[in-house]
Design a protein with these regions (language model features):
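Iron-sulfur-associated redox domains of electron-transfer enzymes in respiratory
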Residues: 1-242
Length: 242
């Protein structure tokens, strides 16, 4: 067993995808509006089952977790010399929907993750060792925009657009999709839809309640740069995102 640590976390990938989205919008893409975020697997299934007319509105891009997994595997390949099939990539996720998505990826030919662990399970194992730490080393590989994706409104804010709508809670999302299907919100360019209250911080596998978690995230963002990552058209993410 060989452990290979990487910095390709979901927040870093979120910043790359946000930067790509800004480039796409400035170049006149996409054509179908409003675009719907792919970040929540529950919402993707909801659209396919109940709102099939809105499938063309789903943004044609991978999710931050998927992009992070692909980049992490490539980094591990380069570091170890092992073939990709000999490398395991696992995610720590906030909800059961993302556990399922780890094994059945939307829009990809095959899953890019080998499995997923619930945040609460990892947290409980780390609780005692964390208490023994005398000094905490900052390890964030993303800035405000990437870390902000964890709560509702963060993805919209990272796009730096004024015509974005963020909705959380499954019933609220259903009502919004009904309005979009009926053409009642033509001014919107982008929909950030989260099944969980307050976004991913409200996932059932989290330890903290979503409102307290959102407050803690605001504290973590203090002093961070706006973003630490950019989408490079000739960079590491080009062949994955496009």
């Amino acid at each position: 067993f060989m452990q290979c640590e990487t910095e390709d976390d979901a927040a870093k990938a979120a910043e790359i995808l946000s930067d790509y989205a800004r480039h796409a919008i400035s170049s006149g893409e996409p054509r179908v509006m409003p675009q719907v975020s792919t970040a929540c697997p529950t919402i993707m299934r909801l659209i396919r089952m109940r709102f099939p007319k809105l499938i063309p509105n789903i943004a044609a891009t991978v999710t931050p977790v998927e992009l992070a997994a692909i980049l992490a595997r490539r980094e591990a390949e380069a570091e170890t010399g092992l073939p990709p099939e000999a490398i395991g990539v696992f995610a720590i996720v906030p909800c059961s929907s993302k556990v399922t998505a780890a094994r059945v990826s939307e829009g990809l030919s095959r899953p890019v993750l080998d499995g997923a662990f619930a945040i609460r399970d990892i947290y409980l194992r780390l609780l005692n060792p964390m208490r023994e730490l005398e000094e905490i080393t900052p390890m964030a590989s993303a800035g405000i925009l990437g870390l902000g994706w964890a709560s509702c409104g963060g993805e919209s804010a990272a796009r730096l657009g004024e015509r974005c709508v963020a909705v959380d809670g499954i019933q609220n999302v259903i009502r919004m999709l009904e309005e979009i299907e009926d053409g009642r919100l033509p001014e919107a360019d982008f929909l950030e839809l989260s099944a969980c209250t307050q976004g991913c911080v409200g996932g059932c596998f989290n330890v903290e309640n979503p409102y307290a978690a959102k407050l803690r995230i605001k504290g973590l963002l203090k002093g961070l740069p706006v973003s630490r990552n950019r989408f490079l058209f000739h960079g590491e993410a080009r062949d994955i995102v496009r």
